[in-house]
Amino acid sequence: MSHVELQPGFDFQQAGKEVLAIERECLAELDQYINQNFTLACEKMFWCKGKVVVMGMGKSGHIGRKMAATFASTGTPSFFVHPGEAAHGDLGMVTPQDVVIAISNSGESSEITALIPVLKRLHVPLICITGCPESSMARAADVHLCVKVAKEACPLGLAPTSSTTATLVMGDALAVALLKARGFTAEDFALSHPGGALGRKLLLRVNDIMHTGDEIPHVKKTASLRDALLEVTRKNLGMTVICDDNMMIEGIFTDGDLRRVFDMGVDVRRLSIADVMTPGGIRVRPGILAVEALNLMQSRHITSVMVADGDHLLGVLHMHDLLRAGVV
């Protein structure tokens, strides 16, 4: 395209709003296609013992990739196969236990129609999403989902706009309907998103990130305050636990306790840790969610907490551990 000058006073906002108005109207019309065929499609996907395989060419392929990703992350195992690659070997990934969703606005994608006889021989259930109920794909489908739109938002009527939006929304409708039917929970969602913020909050537990073994700062009750301070410094967690030979907790000493000792004006060289420790101390169980430990630490205004099974010391958790894990 040759260089053109911007028309004086061209209103980008108005052009954008016109697109939204057209696509909003098309989506409102889509409601009529959430019908018995939609139920049949959902049932085939719900009872599928394999995976939902999504296919599409061009812009429909881009929508198909997103659709497969949404299915997979909401409890319906799914993947995308490019129809061109399917015709050259990738169709081997499809089994009779799968369900295929084929997308084409015209319903006449030659790359997809060429695959239909093979899918039929494999007895793979076929759901076609098209904008043309009389198309080849619609007639060949076990279930046809219509996404016909009155017009594209593109003023030339050429660039897929309203039609791709309608297809995307139909995919979301399938995914969410199945999600609800399966009783899919936030915890289930987190399992497929372990790297996301929600996944970390719903999956990461204290025992995944706590300090254990030699990393635990601890001294005996008979230790001097000086020895306890050396342990605090060596382990760099701002505290030390006071425990016996069996790692049974007797108390805790933190950098906050040290400041209070200095405020008392006593000779710290003559003190034992038993003189200044806090008996007992706050502790959490190793199996609780890291975010629960975070909430406790924030409510108690502490930066570290003991991890224990009853009085038996198992580890120590510091606020920095939660920061590194992305929980905060």
From Swiss-Prot:
One GO BP annotation of this record: lipopolysaccharide biosynthetic process
Binding site for Zn(2+): H82
Start and end residues of each SIS domain: 42-184
Swiss-Prot/TrEMBL catalytic activity: D-arabinose 5-phosphate = D-ribulose 5-phosphate
InterPro entries: CBS_dom, CBS_dom_sf, GutQ/KpsF_isomerases, KdsD/KpsF-type, SIS_dom, SIS_dom_sf, SIS_Kpsf
Family recorded in the similarity comment: Belongs to the SIS family. GutQ/KpsF subfamily.
GO molecular function, one term: carbohydrate derivative binding
Name by which UniProt lists this protein: Arabinose 5-phosphate isomerase KdsD
Domain CBS: 210-268, 277-328
Oligomer status and interactors: Homotetramer.
Keyword Metal-binding: yes
A Pfam family recorded for this sequence: CBS
UniProt key word Hydrolase: no
Pathway: Carbohydrate biosynthesis; 3-deoxy-D-manno-octulosonate biosynthesis; 3-deoxy-D-manno-octulosonate from D-ribulose 5-phosphate: step 1/3; Bacterial outer membrane biogenesis; lipopolysaccharide biosynthesis
Record-listed E.C. numbers: 5.3.1.13
Record: residues binding substrate: 75-76, 82, 88, 114-123, 148-150, 222, 275
Keyword set, alphabetical order: Carbohydrate metabolism, CBS domain, Isomerase, Lipopolysaccharide biosynthesis, Metal-binding, Repeat, Zinc
Residue numbers marked as site, Catalytically relevant: K59, E111, E152, H193
Role played: Involved in the biosynthesis of 3-deoxy-D-manno-octulosonate (KDO), a unique 8-carbon sugar component of lipopolysaccharides (LPSs). Catalyzes the reversible aldol-ketol isomerization between D-ribulose 5-phosphate (Ru5P) and D-arabinose 5-phosphate (A5P).
